């Protein structure tokens, strides 16, 4: 029973991974950053009561649900980029989409840290600028 369940999970996981073009460093980074962003958002609202997503700045289930829905749609857009790559015979649309979303998640994490009063190291600020420029240059190449 246990082996069958594990095998089923492996098959489903492998299928989903193949839909996204593989489980590479970019996709792993995006998923990790999405988790960090969601977690830091919970801390901002639950501990610091300083969220800009709710009227009183504290935890609200609807705001959390909206955040999870956004994360899900983000992954669907990555899936669309991957499938477009396959149809067009290219390999850069998915990467451009993932890099853009990594930059977006990084900005959100830094904003959440700022709402908690955490000082942001300049190297992180510079890395965000590099990610933004890379995403913009890939957008221009795709036009």
Question: Predicted regions span which residues?
Answer:
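Alpha-helical transmembrane segments of multipass membrane proteins
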Residues: 11-16, 79, 83
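Helix-coil boundary and interhelical linker segments in multi-pass alpha-helical membrane proteins
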Residues: 16-27, 84-93
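Alpha-helical transmembrane segments of multi-pass membrane proteins
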Residues: 30-41, 74, 78-82, 100-108
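N-terminal intrinsically disordered, cationic/polar leader segments
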Residues: 32, 41-44, 48-51, 65
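A cytosolic-side transmembrane-helix exit/cap motif
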Residues: 46-59, 112-122
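Juxtamembrane helix-capping/reentrant segments at transmembrane boundaries
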Residues: 51-74
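Hydrophobic alpha-helical transmembrane segments and immediately flanking/interface helices
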Residues: 87-115
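Canonical alpha-helical transmembrane segment with a positive-inside/aromatic-interface signature
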Residues: 106-139
